[in-house]
Amino acid sequence: MSIRRIVLVFKTHFDIGFTRLSEEILDYYATDMLDRVAATCDATAELGPMRYIWTMPAWPLKEMRRRCTPERRAKLDDLVARGQVAWHALPFTSHYDFCGIEDAIYGLGVARELSRFYQKPISRAAKMTDVPGHGRFLPEMLASGGVEYLHLGCNTFAKPVDVPPIFWWEAPSGKRVLTMYNSGYGTSLLPPQDWPLDTWIALLNTQDNSGPQSAQIVLDYYAKLRSAFPDAEISCGSLDD
């Protein structure tokens, strides 16, 4: 295994209703959660390629901005401008086999709305967590919407489908999406021994609504990766990297 490049992607699983009432969760994201994200981002802002970048689904980010105070909104806008808060192409995890075409189009539109507002590129990557399986409508929908990469993290108690570590998921139409499907919400820090590529995305996903990693954890991750791969390019990034 020859790893040339490692990208650390940091994310929290957004679950509206599992850990608290829905309104309480949304308010938490717009207050304490945002403050914690800002603290880690600020603490790592001078670390160059290792500055913390937090990736969110599009809809809770939009809702966070709508609900937060003007002071927090200004801070959030600054973090987005600095590239330390990012979002992917989907609004949240969903059961898309129960959705109609209109639902799918609306869902993809939330991320595009944020891209227009913040004048950022449209995301070409998507992430869903906590749903054990998805049907073949998903690659059709995503590829039609310009999404090229998908990460799926199934529940830890569920056995994932026996697929390669990274594969092309092809819809009946022939459209396809590059896909990773892991047991658990994210990936391991280090790539598996059978990883076939020279780039590794370490998707470090914290549990339901639990918030961002600390600056010290970011430094610890870097030290472990640098020890294992002394010649690799290591950086924090988003799913689009």
What are these regions (language model features)?
Residues M1-D241:
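Catalytic-domain carbohydrate-binding cleft regions of carbohydrate-active enzymes
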